[in-house]
UniProtKB/Swiss-Prot annotation:
EC nos: 2.7.7.8
Domain S1 motif: 625-693
Source organism (scientific name): Streptococcus pneumoniae (strain Taiwan19F-14)
Localization per record: Cytoplasm
One GO MF term: magnesium ion binding
One of the protein's GO biological processes: mRNA catabolic process
Name of the gene encoding the protein in the UniProt record: pnp
Name of the protein in question: Polyribonucleotide nucleotidyltransferase
Primary location: cytoplasm
Length: 737
């Protein structure tokens, strides 16, 4: 296929798609150029159906450091495991694509996005999402797309599509919305306490922009798209299905309606084991034994799926007996752990999360060195999901994509209410340990995080709570569920997580298994989530009504001062000599950022105060009209140089030493004398003039005697040091400098 180029303008930037030139052995490949960001996307599919009971889709987002003109960090100087941002972007692309494959499709599909050049003002992740959909759509892979996604900001009351870096920094909203031309099917967002109305407006305007991108994709597919391959789908034997339903459906229905999770799981598993044993014996010698037993397992799964949905839509009863808008029993505890800087334990039904707070100096911030310019990350929220939380054995090791994603969601929800660095000069880490799980553990971790922050004395703006909403839809009718449990998440159509304060939403995340949901469903889900959020906040505020006024005794004491950026080198000194001396003298630790924020921490408050005094002295600046106790450090014919403080000297001109005339500076001061001086002038080069006489009483005007002659002039004021007399003088030398 020859190279073809397609071009349009989207959100004020040029969008160019190239096909038929590179990666031609993949089932589908495109090069997407958005602004100066360039992403190569290749999609491939296995020839045969994979084993297993799930669709093996893998989406990668690979950040090549050369794309930003940078070397990879580390000893090897080569890209290694994906960064957290790359992992989150891969999940972001996977989620709207996954529902667009047919039920029963089991061939392995890989979609690989490689960032070849990076423009921070033109979203490479959105280009990758566009490219992923387009590569699948023009390929022979049976993908029921296209889909597209956009980023949405909210600046000065205006909705902005794909905001620039500068706009994103000012935005009150960081939203990614994806979908088909008919409906939204994925949402990911952080927000600064925005109302449900603003969030809904942003979602709908984002979807309008999505439609533009889909229309562009359809134009390209019409020009270069391949015919879709005929692929075997997983279908169960209809006669076998009817036989099992007739014999065992009533038993399975009773098992599904057991309210307690572990008892329900045991009851349903007992039915499945019974059916499996019957058919293993019946078809033990059959040549298609493996296929038959696979069908049996799939039929039992479909029966459980159908019964859960029937209970909710027809009987209006949930598996655990709750109403559709009812939250499970809640419990909140603070100070669960001693010694730590803060802890909170939050329980919702059979979902339980423990959050532990750690505070540290700013030197402990995480340095993020990716495609964007390097920056320091002050707040971290980590989420751990051990297998014992669901009563199972399993893999232990580094966090997977799910744990990284849930941690990031909690981080977005809580980051919106954290105090500024000036208000609270600490690095903050929260770790959520999921101790029990029966659905919505990520939202439990947000609630537990709020408890830990408040108990630890972190002055957050407001408590944050989170709730997960679900959906059961048959295409014509739907039911929105509040606080979904694991079974409802597994067999339902939507997992819509909403976190926020009483004043507004701080985070959204939505994943669906159908091809999209309507504005009507979104509106109802947001309203229902708000009601539930307030109920949870009532419980949190009853447990700890306000942030504690003091940090835990075990938390480090930190104080901060702000210095001018051009003074940083003075505090650090040549080769770090000055700052090392301060640390050695006081025993504190000191962090200085590029904006001039100096953080000093120690367990000893007196040591912190001493270090602050030293640093304040180093960066102190003289000001006109201020008075200083200064030491004479040098004498010249035209005056004396005095040290005001640290390395700051001033000149006291001979004419500014006394109200009476003198021809020798040494008659008034000597090196080492301490004198009071007042700053009278600072020139544009920073040179300082000071005066001694400005602090002395002005002598009265000379009086005339009867002959009209002036009386003798008054004696000069005696100097501080009176160990030797001062010589009188009669001549006034010419002033020179």
């Amino acid at each position: 296929m020859a190279k073809q180029v397609f071009q349009t303008t989207f959100a004020g930037r040029e969008l160019i798609v190239e096909t038929g030139q590179v990666a031609k052995q993949a089932n589908g490949s495109v090069v997407v150029r958005y602004g100066e960001s360039t992403v190569l996307t290749a999609a491939v599919m296995s020839k045969k159906m994979a084993t297993g009971d799930f669709f093996p889709l893998q989406v990668n987002y690979e950040e090549k450091m050369y794309a930003a003109g940078k070397f990879p960090g580390g000893f090897m100087k080569r890209e290694g495991r994906p960064s957290t941002d790359a992992t989150l972007t891969a999940r972001l692309i996977d989620r709207p694509i996954r529902p667009m494959f047919a039920e029963g499709f089991r061939n392995e599909v890989q979609v690989i996005n490689t960032v070849l050049s990076y423009d921070e003002n033109a979203s490479a992740p959105m280009a990758a999402m566009f490219g992923s959909s387009l590569a699948l759509s023009i390929s022979d892979i049976p993908f029921d797309g296209p889909i597209a996604g956009v980023q949405v900001g909210y600046v000065d009351g205006q909705i902005i599509i794909n905001p620039s870096q500068e706009q994103a920094e000012q935005s009150l909203l960081e939203l990614t919305v994806a979908g088909t031309k008919h409906a939204i099917n994925m949402v990911e967002s952080g927000a600064k306490e925005l109302s449900e109305e603003i969030m809904l407006e942003a979602l709908l305007k984002g979807h309008e922009a999505v439609k533009e991108l889909i229309a562009f994709q359809e134009e390209i597919v019409a020009a270069v798209g391949k015919e879709k391959a005929e692929v075997e789908l997983l279908h169960v034997d209809a006669e076998l299905q009817a036989e099992i339903i007739a014999a065992y459906n009533s038993d399975l229905q009773k098992a599904v309606q057991v309210e307690e999770k572990l008892a329900r799981e045991a009851a349903t598993q007992a039915v499945k084991d019974q059916v499996t044993a019957v058919y293993e014996e019946k078809y033990a010698d059959h040549e298609e034994f493996d296929r038959i037993m696979r069908d049996v397992a799939e039929i039992l799964e479909q029966m459980e799926h159908a019964e859960v949905r029937r209970l909710i839509t027809e009987d209006k009863v949930r598996p655990d007996g709750r109403k559709v808008d009812e939250i499970r029993p809640l419990d909140a505890v603070v100070d669960f752990l001693p010694r730590v800087h803060g802890s909170g334990l939050f329980t919702r039904g059979q979902t339980q999360a423990l959050s532990v707070l750690t505070l540290a100096p700013m030197g402990e911030t995480q340095i993020i060195d990716g495609l964007d310019p390097e920056y320091k990350k002050r707040f971290m929220h980590h989420y751990n999901f051990p297998q014992y939380s669901v009563g199972e054995t399993g893999r232990y090791g580094a966090p997977g994509r799910r744990e990284i994603g849930h941690g990031a969601l909690g981080e977005r929800a809580l980051a919106q209410v954290l105090p500024s660095l000036e208000e609270f000069p600490y690095a903050i880490r929260l770790v959520a340990e999921v101790l029990e799980s029966n659905g919505s553990s990520s939202q439990a971790s947000i609630c537990a995080g709020t408890l830990a922050l408040m108990a630890g004395g972190v002055p957050i703006k407001a408590p944050v709570a989170g709730i997960a909403m679900g959906l059961i839809s048959d295409g014509n009718n739907y039911t929105v569920l509040t606080d979904i449990q694991g079974l409802e998440d597994h067999f339902g159509d939507m997992d819509f997580k909403v976190a926020g304060t009483r004043d507004g939403i701080t985070a959204l995340q939505m994943d669906i298994k159908i091809q999209g949901i309507t504005a009507e469903i979104l509106t109802e889900a947001l309203a229902q989530a708000k009601k539930a959020r307030f109920e949870i906040l009532d419980v949190i505020e009853a447990t700890i009504p306000e942030v504690r006024p003091e940090l835990a005794p075990t938390a480090p004491k930190i104080d901060t001062i702000k210095i001018d950026v051009d003074k940083i080198k003075i505090v650090i000194g040549k080769g770090g000599e000055t700052i090392d001396k301060i640390i050695a003298e006081t025993g504190v630790k000191i962090d200085i950022d590029e904006e001039g924020n100096v953080s000093i921490y120690s367990s000893d408050q007196d040591a912190i105060n001493r270090a602050k005094e030293i640093i304040a002295g180093l960066v102190r600046e003289a000001k006109v009209d201020e008075v200083y106790r200064a030491k004479v450090v040098r004498i010249e014919k035209f005056g004396a140089f005095v040290n005001l403080f640290d390395k700051t000297d001033a000149l006291v001109h001979i004419s500014e030493m006394a109200w009476t005339r003198t021809n020798r500076v040494e008659d008034l001061v000597e090196i080492g004398d301490e004198v009071d001086v007042k700053v009278i002038k600072i020139d544009e080069k920073g040179r300082i003039d000071a005066s001694m006489k400005a602090l002395l009483p002005r002598p009265p005007k000379p009086e005339h005697d009867e002959k009209g002659e002036k009386s003798e002039r008054p004696h000069r004021p005696r100097h501080h040091k009176d160990h030797k007399p001062k010589k009188e003088f009669t001549e006034t030398p010419k002033d020179s400098e």
